Amino acid sequence: MYNTRRSAYMNSCSTAMELPPQSLHQNWQDTEYVNTTCSSDMNSDMSMYNDDKDDPFYEDEGSGGGTSGGGKKSSRKRANTTSSSGGNEKESKRTANKVCRVCGDKAFSYNFNVITCESCKAFFRRNANKEKEIRCPFNEQCEINMVSRRFCQRCRLTKCFAVGMKKEWIMSEEARLEKKQRVEENRERRLQDAMNRALEEACMEDESENSYDEAPAPSHQMSVRQYLANDDAPHKSSDEVQPHLGHHGYNQKEDKMMNFYQDGPSDQGDYSLPSNSCASSSQLDTSVNCGATTIADNGASPSNTVTIPAAVDVERKPIPTNVLFSASMSAIQDVAAIISNAETKNLGMCAPDVVNENLMNVAQAAVQAQAIVNHTQQLAAAVVAQQVVSNMAPVMPTVNPLDPLLAPAFIAPPMPTPINVPITTPIAGALSTPLPPPIVPPGHSSINPVIPIIPKEMPVSVSLLNQLEQTPAEMVTVPKDMLMKLIQKNSRSTCTCSCMCGRYPPGSCIVDEVTKDLLNGGSSNSSNATDRDETRLETTEDMQMNGLLPGDCNSSIQWLNQQSSAQAFVDPITHSMTAEEAQTQRERRDSIFGSFSAADQGTVTQPKSVQEETIWEHTVAENESRELSDEEIEKMEELTEISNQWISMRLDSMPILDLFSKKNVEKIVNGLKLLSSFRFLPQVDKRSVVKRGLFNYCVVKWMQHKESMSIDGLSDAARRDFMNIIRREEFNYRVQPGAFNTLAISVLFHSISDNLISTDVYMEHLVFKKLLDKNLPIKVSSDTVYNNYYPYIIKAAKHLEKATKGLSDELVAHAVS
């Protein structure tokens, strides 16, 4: 069919040209592409991947040996396949923000249960399960770092096991091969799915391109030419039909392709005009020309203008609107199809001026047909509106109101003047649907009826009473008589009486509380009233409403003072309950919120400080979220590792003064290097932290291990200060996991505001102070513990600094370096 339409179009051209058969299926650009690429396709090793860019291991360069079909020189060389070159986008996006626990190099994540670098991960996987014994070339005490890790395999492997790496987590050879096989299968499956999707998309594109040509014309639509031809068929004979474009024979019986489109030329049409004539060359006249459409397909059929014969009486035989509408829509679709399909590429070797002329003819015909449809619809709408107004006029009665003030509201609108202008364009198609007969009001036939009586709206209370009286049930959530009295005596003003007897919370509105009781369980006299009283004291809001807890508007101390002064008048608990019930409520409240009741306290003393006054609010604000973030979890793991190293080096069993020898100071500093917060500080800040905070750090470590670490060699005053530390209440918090480890690092980084080491050190101090808050028990603030404990720690550290005469700069520099 496509070839037939193509040949019909070529026959209509003034200069027909012979085209090869393959040109009917592809344009000259496609032919050129096939000719230029066939050689490269034939010489390709893999026809599916014949593009050099598809090979991830090779890339093109400007210089090379062979030449391609396009004349470009190219060569193939091995490309970089490391992750830094973008081979693995996931690895390149990762950031090595962790530190290897074995050598100190940068690491990505956990490997075999420990944060390690890629080098130590591979080393442990290769050597952990080896049966061959590895010997240390030195003294088996090698310090493993980024440089020395490749010198001693034994010490490196020993440290891997020491930090917690597990060889049980290494995959066996069978498991590794199985995992590799699964990866290969998944890769092949994804490749096959991608190829299937590509084939489906290609098929869908081909179907969408051919859908316009293969779509049959709707049976209920008719073109203008077909309508006129069918109407004029009895007046013409088949001999009078003129051949199309005289010098080319056109057999209408054999070839019906021109009737494929709904606005195509019919079998009995008039084609007397030249093929290059334009429908817009003559002025648009609705009494002569009803429409003109053209054929628009992939072959770009020529434009034709259809003229209605003079014998056709338009007023006697009007053209229906659906015919005009289908013709205009078809023409518009033809224009869109030609533009979207790039008709200039599908015309083969045709001249460009012929193509442009055809496009202009199609566009002008579409505009003309649309104008005819719009004009017809406007005239039809005007006639319909006139008839509707004339039919509705008798329905509106003329009213003579008794009150002159109401006259403007009831005056009937004036009768519209009928349209006497004759309509030249037929509107029979628009008025094909019969209009409904005019509505005649029943009964009153007089012209001036009385004013209609508008019934007054019944009050809501009356309607509710009528509904309740008709209800067969005796109970409607509440007794019917009670509800009826409430409705009858309903007042627009809201009752504001408050409860003073203790039945409801002090100051609460009785109406609101009774409404809540009715909604919850029916009558307030029901048997479950006691249960509701007990459940009202389960939440914080209920406690605050009943005066058992401080509200948002006052502090804890102010609330206690108010409760102590109000005890002489009414007790919200004991007034409405027995002694046993009141004690039960107090125990329930105290188990949830703590003992803060004024009834349990004899006298309320004034606070000692502002900090103790706001301890409740501060504690709730600080302990809202006790979840540890990922960064905080890593810091806690580092603190645990430092503590384990302190014990492994036997520093927990020696006198406290021996910790400040040169060898032990180096051990302590090496342990602190496991902490990323200390390791990433500048060298100058590290020395300042060690010189000023190491004594504070050792005091807290002595508090952790006071049973095994002695304080021999200190003066009596120093002993008393050390004993005062462990006698304080805060000393009991050392049983909390990680609490004193965090406190030790926090006092290590602490510096007074007048003499800050640096901003980085102070920020690290705040980080560990916040971490201390999450390690302490709930309702305990880190500010309270730190501010109450830190002066005693400083005082004990001064004794140590005085007894050891401080740390020399040479010792600190050697330990830190």
From Swiss-Prot:
Subcellular location: Nucleus
GO molecular function, one term: RNA polymerase II cis-regulatory region sequence-specific DNA binding
One Pfam family, short name: zf-C4
Location of region: Disordered: 49-91, 202-221, 258-284
Name of this chain's protein: Nuclear hormone receptor family member nhr-48
Listed GO biological process terms: cell differentiation; intracellular receptor signaling pathway; negative regulation of transcription by RNA polymerase II; positive regulation of transcription by RNA polymerase II
Swiss-Prot/TrEMBL keywords: DNA-binding, Metal-binding, Nucleus, Receptor, Transcription, Transcription regulation, Zinc, Zinc-finger
SUPFAM superfamilies recorded: Glucocorticoid receptor-like (DNA-binding domain) (SSF57716)
Biased composition (Polar residues): 273-284
Location (main, coarse): nucleus
Function: Orphan nuclear receptor.
Stated family: Belongs to the nuclear hormone receptor family.
Gene Ontology CC annotation, any one: nucleus
Renumbered zinc finger spans (NR C4-type): 100-120, 136-155
Biased composition (Gly residues): 63-72
Acidic residues compositional bias, start-end: 52-62, 202-212
Superkingdom to which the source organism belongs: Eukaryota
DNA-binding residues: 97-172
Lineage start: Eukaryota, Metazoa, Ecdysozoa, Nematoda, Chromadorea
